[in-house]
Amino acid sequence: MENCTEVTKFILLGLTSVPELQIPLFILFTFIYLLTLCGNLGMMLLILMDSCLHTPMYFFLSNLSLVDFGYSSAVTPKVMAGFLRGDKVISYNACAVQMFFFVALATVENYLLASMAYDRYAAVCKPLHYTTTMTASVGACLALGSYVCGFLNASFHIGGIFSLSFCKSNLVHHFFCDVPAVMALSCSDKHTSEVILVFMSSFNIFFVLLVIFISYLFIFITILKMHSAKGHQKALSTCASHFTAVSVFYGTVIFIYLQPSSSHSMDTDKMASVFYAMIIPMLNPVVYSLRNREVQNAFKKVLRRQKFL
């Protein structure tokens, strides 16, 4: 279906139009983005440099850091430019590209979290068979499958949304080209597209949640059968970081995306999207390092090396 007007650009209305808040928000988001950059790239380098971290668990964690950095970078620099220069215009094609990479990488993270849950299940429930269950090739296949699912899902989303007609307005009530905000601008009958996209999003989320739920069900059953307090503590600490990341990630995703557009409050979605697109990528390296002795020890090794240089 062709657009009934030649829409060549969208205008992102941003988080706020209050002039006094533009510079403080620019400073805040620059700080958040720098922490995201340092935290995620630092985690990747740490895993790469320390041979003790060359295991499936940390292979998935390095991919998670890459994805967090990627989808934050798809959004945050444009938001910062809007605060600093008032540059809120985004071309039609740039909007499609931004949405594609954001949806793709967020979906990749979705499947990586499921892969990490399976890895934790194998480590806690079948420790004697862990090295044969989670081989390097199995880890690589799970990671590759996550990327394939992510980019296929994004392709369907972009195809479904940008085949619609845009003739009402080009004012996007958001700070980036998010799916609900752009779809709301369409003057086409978007019921079918919306149902398909909600179905796909629901499938991606609930399939992964089912995998995570089953993995943790077996993990908790195994923990309850353990007789030593040390075993309990080790198993719980192994899973605590991942469980925290899963809870935060899916709580926000379900809140934003699994509602019909008629029930969306754009202002509420904006606040949730800040958390989802910027805060979570910043927090993940912290969550995975605070209670992880192996990461802490690797970091201490790096610091000791720097002292001797």
UniProtKB/Swiss-Prot annotation:
Gene Ontology terms: biological process: G protein-coupled receptor signaling pathway; sensory perception of smell
Residues bearing carbohydrate: 3
Pfam family, one: 7tm_4
Membrane-spanning intervals of the chain: 24-47, 56-77, 99-118, 138-156, 194-217, 235-257, 271-290
Molecular function terms from GO: G protein-coupled receptor activity; odorant binding; olfactory receptor activity
Cell membrane recorded as keyword: yes
Localization terms from the record: Cell membrane
Family annotation (CDD domains): 7tmA_OR5B-like (cd15407)
Keyword match Endoplasmic reticulum: no
Cytoplasmic face residues: 48-55, 119-137, 218-234, 291-309
Keyword terms of this UniProt record: Cell membrane, Disulfide bond, G-protein coupled receptor, Glycoprotein, Membrane, Olfaction, Receptor, Sensory transduction, Transducer, Transmembrane, Transmembrane helix
Intervals, Extracellular compartment: 1-23, 78-98, 157-193, 258-270
Disulfide bonds listed in the record: 95-187
Biological role stated in the UniProt entry: Odorant receptor.
Family: Belongs to the G-protein coupled receptor 1 family.
Protein name: Olfactory receptor 5B2
Gene source species: Homo sapiens
Gene label: OR5B2
